[in-house]
C-alpha cells in the first residue's frame, strides 16, 4: 500500500522531511570539505588562477594562470600585498577601465570595507558569482544551529538588519557595504520560504535607508510577533544594543501604536508604512498592556527574556572589538546564550562557528576550504605591529599546516581577484575540525579604538589630536600627554573618550568650555569617513568626549605601569587603554569633561581618491539633526 502511505503524509510533514534532508546534506558538505581540506585548497587555487588567467595583475607577475604549474608559479612569485599596493588597479576599475585588471570576470560592484585608506573606505572589487558563494555559506548556518537548538522552525527570528547608503563610481559600478549588497540582492529579496528563516522584519523596513524609520518599523513588528519570536539578534553586538536603547527610549509610542493599530506619523516611507500596516492588523490593547508592563518596570535587567519570552538565544558577533559589549548583552539578556555564528569580511566570507552555543570566550571559527585560498603569516605575539620587519611571502603557511596555539595573520587569494591579500586579522589556532583548523579571533592589527564598524589607528588619532589642540594656542595652553579608550559601558551607543593633561601659563586666561567643545569636534572631523558616517548618518557612535585630568596624572600612570613590571627605559604613555584599573586611575583625576557639540560632516556619494579625477558622483552631506535615533 505505498500509495496510501504517501497520500497520508501531509504537505507540512513532507516539507519538514525535505528540510531535514537538506540540512543533512549541508552538514555532510562541511564534513567532506573539512576532511579533505588540503585537496580542496589546491583545487580552489587552481580554479582561481584558471578563471583569472587573463588578469593583467597575474600577467605582470609572470604567473600563467591557465598553464600547467600555475599554482607553483603563484606560490613562488606572488608577493604579499596590502590595499595600498593594489589601490592604483582599484582606481582604474572605479574610473571605468573594463579590461581584466584583477579578475578575469567583469567586476560587478565594489564592496566598501570598514577599514580605511587615506581616511576613506577601502573599495573591494567583487564579481557576480561571489554573491552565490556568500549565500552558500549563509545556508550552512541553520543546519549547524539546529543540531544544538531544536525547534527553530516553529517560530520567527527578530533579526534587526539595516542598509547603508551607496553610490556609484565614476565608471558606473555600485559601491556599498557587503551586507547592503546582500540585502538588496535577489538572494535575500527572492529567497524561497524556509521555516528556519522566517523574519519578523518586512523587507521594506530592512531596505529603508532612514535609520529612525527602519528601526521603529522593525521593532514594532518584532513586538507584534513577540509570542512567536524564538531568537533575536543583529549582525554586530553594537547594533543590537542600539536597538534595545531605542526600545528603552521609544516604548511608549510603540505601545501606543500597537494599542491603536496605527503606525506613528514619524514613519513616513510609504513602502514601510504599507508593510507594517499589514503586520499590525488592527488594535491590540492586550498586547500593548503586556509589553508596557515589562518596559515600565524600573530595571531593564533581563528585558529581552521578558518582552520576548520564548527567545532561546541572542545571535550577534561578540568577537574582536564586539567583545566589549558582552556584559551589557548579558544584563539585558538575563542569561540568554550569546550565539556567534559566522566570520566574514568585505574581502571574502571565511567560515563559521560549528559550536555556536559555546561561551563567547570559546568562540572558534572553522574556515571553509571552498571559500577562497587561505594562507597564514606567522605572528610573533611579543612584537609590535609597527616595529616588526616587513614580512615575506616565503614565510606563509598553508591552511592545513598551521599549528595549535600559534597566532597568524590571515592572507587570502579570492575568486574576485585579490592575491595574497593581507586581511589584517590576527587569529589563534584553537583546534581542528577534521583537517581544517578552527581559529579564535585575537585582534585587528593596528586598531586602537573601535565602537561599531569604525577602526581608528594610533597614527590617525594622533594626527587628529595634534590638529585639535591648535584651538588651545590662543590661551597659552598646550597638551602635555593624552590617551584614549572606547567607552561602551556608560552610554549606548558607545563613544570615544580622550584623557588630556594640559599645561597652562600661570595667571593665563582660562580656556572656555566652548573651545574644548571645538577641540572635540575637531578631533572627530580629523577621523576617517567610516567614523564620521557612524556618527552623522548611522548614529552608532556617540559624541566624542574629552576628560581633562589633573597635573601629574600621566606620571602616576607611569608609576602604575612600573609597579606592574614595565621597564622605565622603554615606557611610553599608551595612546589607547582598556577599561579596568588604568581607566579608573584616570577617571579619579578628572577635573572637567566636554563633549562634541554636533556631528562631524560626512558626505555620502563618493570617495575622494577618485572624486578628484573630475568624474564625481553625487554627494550628500549628512548631519546628526536629520537622524535623531
From Swiss-Prot:
Q: In which tissues is it expressed?
A: Expressed in flowers.
Q: Which InterPro entries does this entry report, sorted A to Z?
A: GH3, GH3_C, GH3_M
Q: What's in the keyword line of the UniProt record? A: Ligase
Coiled-coil annotated residue ranges, if any: none
**What is the residue range of the signal peptide feature?**
none
Q: Which domain of life is it from?
A: Eukaryota
One record GO biological process: response to auxin
Q: What is its EC number?
A: 6.3.2.-
A single GO cellular-component term on record: cytoplasm
List GO molecular-function terms, semicolon-separated: acid-amino acid ligase activity
Triggers of expression = By auxin.
**Is Ligase among the key words of this record?**
yes
The record, for Pfam families, names: GH3, GH3_C, GH3_M
Q: What does this protein do?
A: May catalyze the synthesis of indole-3-acetic acid (IAA)-amino acid conjugates, providing a mechanism for the plant to cope with the presence of excess auxin.
- Give the family from UniProt: Belongs to the IAA-amido conjugating enzyme family.
Give the protein name, as stated in the record.
Answer: Probable indole-3-acetic acid-amido synthetase GH3.4
* Gene, per the UniProt record: GH3.4
Amino acid at each position: 500500500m505505498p500509495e496510501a502511505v504517501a497520500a497520508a503524509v501531509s504537505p507540512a510533514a513532507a516539507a519538514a522531511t525535505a528540510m531535514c534532508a537538506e540540512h543533512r546534506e549541508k552538514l555532510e558538505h562541511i564534513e567532506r570539505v573539512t576532511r579533505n581540506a588540503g585537496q580542496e585548497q589546491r583545487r580552489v587555487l587552481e580554479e582561481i588562477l584558471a578563471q583569472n588567467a587573463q588578469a593583467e595583475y597575474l600577467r605582470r607577475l609572470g604567473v600563467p594562470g591557465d598553464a600547467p604549474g600555475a599554482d607553483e608559479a603563484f606560490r613562488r612569485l606572488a608577493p604579499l600585498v596590502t590595499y595600498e599596493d593594489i589601490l592604483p588597479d582599484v582606481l582604474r576599475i572605479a574610473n571605468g577601465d573594463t579590461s581584466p585588471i584583477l579578475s578575469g570576470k567583469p567586476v560587478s560592484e565594489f564592496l566598501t570595507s570598514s577599514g580605511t585608506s587615506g581616511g576613506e573606505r577601502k573599495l573591494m572589487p567583487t564579481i557576480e558569482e561571489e554573491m552565490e558563494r556568500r549565500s552558500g555559506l549563509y545556508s550552512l548556518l541553520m543546519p549547524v544551529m539546529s543540531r544544538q537548538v531544536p525547534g527553530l522552525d516553529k517560530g520567527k527570528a527578530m533579526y534587526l538588519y539595516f542598509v547603508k547608503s551607496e553610490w556609484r563610481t565614476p565608471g558606473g559600478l555600485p559601491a556599498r557595504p557587503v551586507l547592503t549588497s546582500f540585502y538588496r540582492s535577489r538572494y535575500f529579496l527572492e529567497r524561497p520560504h524556509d521555516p528556519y528563516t522566517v523574519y519578523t522584519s518586512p523587507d521594506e523596513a530592512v531596505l529603508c535607508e532612514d535609520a529612525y524609520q527602519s528601526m521603529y518599523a522593525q521593532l514594532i513588528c518584532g513586538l507584534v510577533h513577540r509570542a512567536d519570536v524564538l531568537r533575536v539578534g543583529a549582525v554586530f553586538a553594537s547594533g543590537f544594543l542600539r536597538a534595545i536603547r531605542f526600545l528603552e527610549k521609544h516604548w511608549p509610542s510603540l505601545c501606543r501604536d500597537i494599542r491603536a493599530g496605527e503606525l506613528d506619523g514619524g514613519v513616513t516611507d510609504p513602502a514601510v508604512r504599507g508593510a507594517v500596516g499589514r503586520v499590525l492588523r488592527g488594535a491590540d490593547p492586550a498586547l500593548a498592556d503586556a509589553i508596557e508592563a515589562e518596559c515600565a518596570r524600573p530595571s531593564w535587567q533581563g528585558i529581552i527574556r521578558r518582552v520576548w519570552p520564548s527567545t532561546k538565544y541572542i545571535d550577534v558577533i561578540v568577537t574582536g572589538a564586539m567583545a566589549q559589549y558582552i556584559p551589557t548583552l548579558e544584563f539585558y539578556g538575563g542569561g540568554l546564550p550569546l550565539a556567534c555564528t559566522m566570520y566574514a569580511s568585505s574581502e571574502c566570507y571565511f567560515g563559521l562557528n560549528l559550536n555556536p552555543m559555546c561561551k563567547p570566550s570559546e568562540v572558534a571559527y572553522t574556515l571553509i576550504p571552498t571559500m577562497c585560498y587561505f594562507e597564514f603569516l606567522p605572528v610573533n605575539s611579543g612584537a609590535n605591529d609597527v616595529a616588526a620587519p616587513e614580512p615575506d611571502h616565503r614565510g606563509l603557511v598553508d591552511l592545513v599546516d598551521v599549528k595549535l596555539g600559534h597566532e597568524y595573520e590571515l592572507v587570502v587569494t579570492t575568486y574576485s581577484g585579490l592575491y595574497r591579500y593581507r586581511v589584517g586579522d590576527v587569529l589563534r589556532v584553537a583546534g581542528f575540525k577534521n583537517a581544517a583548523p578552527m581559529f579564535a579571533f585575537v585582534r585587528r592589527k593596528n586598531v586602537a579604538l573601535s565602537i561599531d564598524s569604525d577602526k581608528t589607528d594610533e597614527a590617525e588619532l594622533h594626527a587628529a589630536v595634534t590638529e585639535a589642540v591648535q584651538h588651545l594656542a590662543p590661551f597659552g595652553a598646550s597638551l602635555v600627554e593624552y590617551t584614549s579608550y572606547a567607552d561602551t559601558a556608560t552610554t549606548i551607543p558607545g563613544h570615544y573618550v580622550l584623557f588630556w593633561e594640559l599645561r597652562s601659563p600661570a595667571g593665563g586666561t582660562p580656556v572656555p568650555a566652548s573651545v574644548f567643545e571645538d577641540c572635540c569636534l575637531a578631533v572627530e572631523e580629523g577621523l576617517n569617513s567610516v567614523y564620521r558616517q557612524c556618527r552623522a548618518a548611522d548614529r552608532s557612535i556617540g559624541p566624542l568626549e574629552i576628560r581633562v585630568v589633573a597635573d601629574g596624572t600621566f606620571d602616576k600612570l607611569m608609576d602604575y605601569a612600573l609597579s606592574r613590571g614595565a621597564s622605565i627605559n622603554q615606557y611610553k604613555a599608551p595612546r589607547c587603554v582598556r577599561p579596568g584599573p588604568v581607566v579608573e586611575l584616570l577617571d579619579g583625576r578628572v577635573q572637567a569633561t566636554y563633549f562634541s557639540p554636533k556631528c562631524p560632516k560626512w558626505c555620502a556619494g563618493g570617495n575622494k581618491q577618485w572624486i578628484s579625477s573630475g568624474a564625481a558622483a553625487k554627494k550628500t552631506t549628512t548631519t546628526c539633526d536629520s537622524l535623531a535615533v
